[in-house]
């Protein structure tokens, strides 16, 4: 029993001696904290990415459409004045000579063609044709084919009432269609400011020109 107690006392003494051998200045290591399983460090929430706000493109303004450009004529060329002529003074003496021509049989039917313009300018032949028919209206030698008969005969050949008879063969065909024995041609030629009036009388049966004449025409304006 004493031996056992002695042994315990010896062990206690040795333990106390060992515990007192820690050198001064030595630091005990800091305790290490072990990370607990299942625990995580808190994290800051990441904000969602911002979406760009869609923008509506601005519509460009439409410029006002310009109105039609109206050009004011500057120094506009005035329209030429219509020329007028003294046709009656030119027709009467020529018709008188034609009625006295040899080979003209009294009582015959005469086809008068429209006056044809062969001048170097614009010339209204309507008044000339009217003056020619007027000079022949009261003659005692010819019976005139009416304007209505002549117009219908021209239309049958595809001509307008204002068209000239044209070729001699065409004139003969129309004259025979209306029963005329003579055709009187007339045309204005030369300078339009002072034209020359020419006439020809043709015998339908032979196509021969049995009379011709010419005279000056005076312009009144």
Curated annotation (Swiss-Prot):
Signal peptide: 1-20
Annotated stretches, region: Disordered: 29-82
GO cellular component term, pick one: periplasmic side of cell outer membrane
Keyword Signal: yes
Start-end of Pro residues biased regions: 44-57
Positions where lipid (N-palmitoyl cysteine) attaches: 21
GO BP field: peptidoglycan biosynthetic process; regulation of cell shape
Record GO terms (molecular function): enzyme regulator activity
Keyword terms of this UniProt record: Cell outer membrane, Cell shape, Lipoprotein, Membrane, Palmitate, Peptidoglycan synthesis, Signal
Subcellular location field: Cell outer membrane
Source organism, top-level taxon: Bacteria
Membrane topology: Lipid-anchor
Pfam families: LpoB
Sites of S-diacylglycerol cysteine lipidation: 21
Biological role stated in the UniProt entry: Regulator of peptidoglycan synthesis that is essential for the function of penicillin-binding protein 1B (PBP1b).
Similarity comment: family membership: Belongs to the LpoB family.
NCBIfam families membership: lp (TIGR02722)
Subunit structure: Interacts with PBP1b.
Protein name from the UniProt record: Penicillin-binding protein activator LpoB
Species the sequence originates in: Cronobacter turicensis (strain DSM 18703 / CCUG 55852 / LMG 23827 / z3032)
Gene expressing this chain: lpoB
